[in-house]
A protein has these predicted regions:
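Post-signal peptide N-terminal segment of mature Sec-exported envelope proteins
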Residues: 43-64
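Bacterial signal peptide processing site
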Residues: 36-39
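Internal, hydrophobic beta-strand segments that form the core of beta-sheet-rich folds
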Residues: 140-155, 159-171
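Extracellular Ig-like/FN3 beta-sandwich strand-entry sites
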Residues: 68-70, 85-87, 139-143
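A short beta-strand element within beta-rich, extracytoplasmic domains
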Residues: 69-81, 144-150
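An anionic, turn-rich surface loop/hairpin at beta-sheet edges
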Residues: 106-137
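Short acidic/polar inter-strand loop motif in beta-rich domains
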Residues: 79-82, 127-130, 135-137, 150-160
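C-terminal motif of bacterial Sec signal peptides marking the signal peptidase cleavage site
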Residues: 32-34
Length: 176
């Protein structure tokens, strides 16, 4: 009668260790480290429950040490069913310590024309990551200020619960 992998053992200095435990011991660290990203910066700001007032500017302060690498800058939004629109207009300003700055207007599409929310979610809460800049080079080392302001017609918009910024170095794919 044959034995299964679970029944096989390896003899090690007088002790027996199940092969499945040995495999698990070697595979677990590989899985753990392969699933982690090397974000340079990733943080969320909480929006008050009453809503995001257009006069309130959400600020983020990443420190960039490597100006040779290129980065992807993503905007993360957390929102609920109480948000009344399909999209969200944002004004984003990035400013270096030297005073250099650039401003963009970003249209974030949160739902399709039938009201089905994009992104991942559970219950009445959703999260979506939106690409803001891809392959971006920061011109100088130092602290940057990234400001995000809602640009909708309503002064206060309910349903947006958090806004975040994630900066990740671009990794080259083998063979490029």
């Amino acid at each position: 009668m044959g034995t299964t992998i679970m029944e096989k053992t390896i003899a090690t200095t007088g002790r027996e260790v199940h092969l499945s435990k040995v495999i698990l011991l070697f595979c677990l660290p590989i899985l753990f480290f392969s699933c982690t990203t090397k974000d340079v910066y990733h943080t969320f700001n909480h929006i008050p429950e009453r809503g995001w007032d257009k006069r309130v500017i959400e600020r983020f302060s990443p420190v960039i040490e490597d100006t040779i690498s290129t980065y992807d800058i993503d905007l993360s939004l957390r929102y609920t069913n109480y948000y009344n629109y399909r999209n969200l207009w944002l004004f984003i300003t990035c400013e270096a310590e030297t005073g250099e700055e650039f401003t963009d207007t970003l249209n974030c599409v949160l739902a399709d024309e039938y009201g089905k929310w994009f992104g991942s979610g559970w219950g009445a809460s959703y999260q979506q990551t939106i690409s803001y800049k891809t392959g971006f080079n920061f011109p100088r080392k130092g602290r940057y200020s990234i400001s995000v302001q809602q640009g909708m017609r309503d002064d206060v918009i309910p349903g947006i619960t958090e806004v975040g910024i994630k900066i990740t170095p671009v990794t080259s794919v083998a063979g490029e």
